[in-house]
């Protein structure tokens, strides 16, 4: 097998994501006829420090959300630069893409254009070598199946309802294999639907497949989930824990946290009190973006108060960016990073962020976006890097289920080598 296999063509197109907005899909063609394809996700609640997602802004087409400019950047500018390069040299190709753009935030070509190419290159290389993507990226040590962080009640920017907190999730930590954990999550999901129905709540779903009922309070979301866990025959605090994505930057206004639906306006210290009360009352194991992306002091306070008890995940805070993560590590802020490929824009930079987190003793949670496609790259990525946790929505809506199904296939392929760490995925928390 050749050690240098040329890229002979790169083709991008505009396709639709799960929220009915356009996104970029890229195909990379190799000299032997091999093809690699990747589609790029898109977020609803986005951090201000994320790499730039290039949109057309033409209100007459897709409400201004078209990506024809990004597609043209791939087909014209990027293709010309990477045709002839060795598909097996991912780091060099990603470096070429970054330099070709020339901006700090990938605002010239668009992170959606660059990421589509970066991921399609990796997929083409894996296909050429005849190996699964997770093995191509991670090598022989890629064997850890992740604990799912399943979003089963949606609020905030992901739903049109009365809940301020964006995501309420279940984590099946008390099981010894991935497939059994997924089954338990599915059973809790169905039990939750019945529970909501019995209380007269809507069972319509949000962007990520979770239910989006008009609950009486944010806390009621946790309470109905705990009820559903028990109805499904499982024990909260043993087999299942709760994870929350507060997405607090969305309700951070003039230095205060405004929980509109609860009629509360809180200081950073009061917001920490709010979450500490929940942690003491409920089996919560993870809180994402509990403080706003600009509130470093609030983050510091939250980490001091809760950092040994629960996983504190930085999403908008870190945006998969090694510079911001380095600052957080130096300040002793958070203890985990959310990994979103399109926040930074290349596979290589994503892997660098995960490596930095691991060296600092931070966990890494590989994540989808609210606007997804059938692309399953993140399922392979989470196994490739042995991250141990994945956040990819409810066990509903095919763009979410596609990732779980890919993980089920990987689990089967790995066989006895596969590991499911359960509670041990939270290696930096007090037991």
UniProtKB/Swiss-Prot annotation:
User: Which spans are transmembrane here?
Assistant: none
Pathway assigned in UniProt: Carbohydrate degradation; glycolysis; pyruvate from D-glyceraldehyde 3-phosphate: step 4/5
Which keywords accompany this UniProt record?
Cytoplasm, Glycolysis, Lyase, Magnesium, Metal-binding, Secreted
InterPro entries given in the database record: Enolase (IPR000941), Enolase-like_C_sf (IPR036849), Enolase-like_N (IPR029017), Enolase_C (IPR020810), Enolase_CS (IPR020809), Enolase_N (IPR020811)
Cofactor names from the entry are: Mg(2+)
**Signal peptide as annotated in the record:** none
Its EC number is: 4.2.1.11
Q: Where is the active site?
A: 208, 340
Give an example GO cellular component term for this record.
extracellular region
Q: Which residues bind Mg(2+)?
A: 245, 288, 315
Q: Which residues bind (2R)-2-phosphoglycerate?
A: 166, 340, 369-370, 391
Return the broad EC class: lyase
Q: How is its cofactor bound, per UniProt?
A: Binds a second Mg(2+) ion via substrate during catalysis.
Protein's job: Catalyzes the reversible conversion of 2-phosphoglycerate (2-PG) into phosphoenolpyruvate (PEP). It is essential for the degradation of carbohydrates via glycolysis.
- State the name under which the record lists this protein: Enolase
Q: Which organism is it from?
A: Clostridium perfringens (strain SM101 / Type A)
Q: Gene encoding it?
A: eno
